[in-house]
């Protein structure tokens, strides 16, 4: 355990506390077991280390990575037992999906060590309610997104902007600080700002994240063969060159040499992993989601990384809107326009010259325009949807 402690100390020393992700103040840190899920590269590890560094006594805390060589000869339950006997109170386990029997052993730790507070992070691919060791009734779960435009401005440019609600956007109640130029950094955010990487070759780093997700995270979770993992990568390449598009599962299945049902499963894995977003129809009621109508890449930064020279600005705009809204509210395809939120608000997304033809006589219809700084009437600037968290 000495080496684990030494590694932990080194990571704490290297952790900056000058910027906090939106999730930092949303987590109930008093819960006995907390799970933080999210795509690779969005800052889960940094958030955990910041909390320990700022809020907890070092002697009561231990942070470990589930892939540490220590676990080649020790079980997670053994570590928890030893840590508890030493008076430990707060155990943090990073990238839990890399530990084979993670669900079973977390359940045992929860049941046998009431004195321990346990937090684990993992890939968004994981389903904690799956299998015999259901953690959903024990762990308080959170899902973390990549950077919003608001967070990007604070992290990389020192610009502070308050979080806005959808209602404020629709009612034109957003107060823009004096001197703030909302479009100055927006294009850069769309191209490279979703992931909190500040140095080096950003494009290469994102490609590494994508490769690790497809080649390691998803196959581990879904017990996929190497051949199927290759098909995942081919499917993502097809989506990157075509998104957004109405999926023809049979046609895609023919290209991948798998059944249409398998295509749907592969798309579900990519979506859970934070690589694509699937826009569905509504089948009665806000939560009644139907068939997939369109498939998008998850965020604009992925478009610029994976689509190469075939980047369409209209696709970037729609992807940004869908990405920034769907994690906090139900978003479905609109029968008359682009998007329907909460089953009642219709949004048409476009450029500065976008007309309102499709929204004439539509109650709760809004036009979302790129390249404008302020809104009026039912027109909302696109950048403002980056202020929701």
Predicted regions mapped to residue ranges:
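Hydrophobic anchor at the beta1->P-loop junction of P-loop NTPases
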Residues: 36
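Interdomain motor-coupling "hinge/lid" segment immediately C-terminal to the ATP-binding subdomain
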Residues: 2-10, 123, 130-236
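Structural recognition of the conserved hydrophobic beta-strand(s) that form the central parallel beta-sheet
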Residues: 92, 117-123
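Conserved lysine of the Walker
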Residues: 44-45
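N-terminal pre-Walker A segment at the start of P-loop NTPase domains
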Residues: 1-26
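Short glycine-rich substrate-engagement loop in P-loop NTPases that contacts/grips substrate
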Residues: 58-90
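Conserved catalytic cores of phosphodiester-cleaving nucleases, focusing on short active-site segments
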Residues: 321, 325, 339-353
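Accessory nucleic acid-recognition modules appended to NTPase machines
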Residues: 194-337
């Amino acid at each position: 355990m000495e080496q684990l402690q030494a590694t932990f100390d080194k990571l704490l020393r290297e952790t900056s506390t000058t910027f906090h992700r939106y999730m930092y103040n949303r987590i109930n840190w008093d819960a006995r077991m907390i799970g933080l899920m999210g795509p690779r590269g969005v800052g889960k590890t940094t958030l955990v280390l910041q909390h320990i560094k700022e809020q907890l006594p070092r002697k009561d805390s231990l942070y470990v990575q589930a892939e540490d060589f220590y676990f080649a000869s020790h079980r997670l339950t053994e570590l928890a037992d030893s840590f508890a006997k030493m008076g430990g109170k707060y155990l943090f386990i990073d990238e839990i999906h890399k530990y084979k029997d993670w669900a079973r052993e977390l359940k045992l730790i929860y049941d046998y060590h009431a004195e321990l507070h346990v937090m684990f992070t993992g890939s968004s691919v994981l389903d904690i309610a799956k299998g015999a060791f259901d953690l959903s009734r024990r762990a308080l779960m959170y899902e973390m997104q990549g950077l919003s435009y608001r967070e990007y401005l604070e992290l990389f440019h020192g610009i502070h902007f308050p979080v806005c609600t959808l209602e404020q956007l629709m009612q034109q109640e957003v107060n823009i600080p004096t001197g703030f130029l909302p479009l100055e950094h927006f294009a850069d955010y769309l191209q490279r700002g979703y992931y909190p990487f500040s140095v080096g070759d950003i494009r290469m780093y994102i490609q590494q994240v994508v490769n690790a997700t497809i080649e390691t995270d998803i196959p581990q979770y879904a017990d996929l063969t190497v051949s199927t993992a290759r098909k995942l990568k081919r499917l993502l390449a097809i989506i990157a060159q075509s998104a957004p598009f109405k999926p023809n599962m049979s046609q895609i299945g023919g290209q991948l040499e798998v059944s249409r049902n398998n295509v749907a499963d592969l798309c579900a894995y990519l979506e859970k992993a934070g690589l694509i977003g699937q826009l569905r129809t509504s089948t009665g009621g806000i939560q009644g989601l139907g068939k997939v109508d369109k498939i998008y890449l998850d965020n604009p930064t992925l478009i610029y990384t994976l689509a190469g020279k075939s980047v369409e600005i209209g696709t970037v705009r729609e992807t940004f809107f869908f990405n920034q809204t769907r994690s906090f509210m139900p978003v479905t395809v609109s029968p008359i326009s682009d998007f329907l939120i909460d089953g009642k608000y219709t949004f048409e997304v476009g450029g500065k010259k976008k007309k309102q033809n499709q929204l004439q006589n539509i109650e709760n219809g809004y036009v979302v325009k790129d390249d404008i700084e302020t809104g009026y009437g039912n027109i909302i600037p696109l950048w403002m949807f980056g202020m929701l968290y």
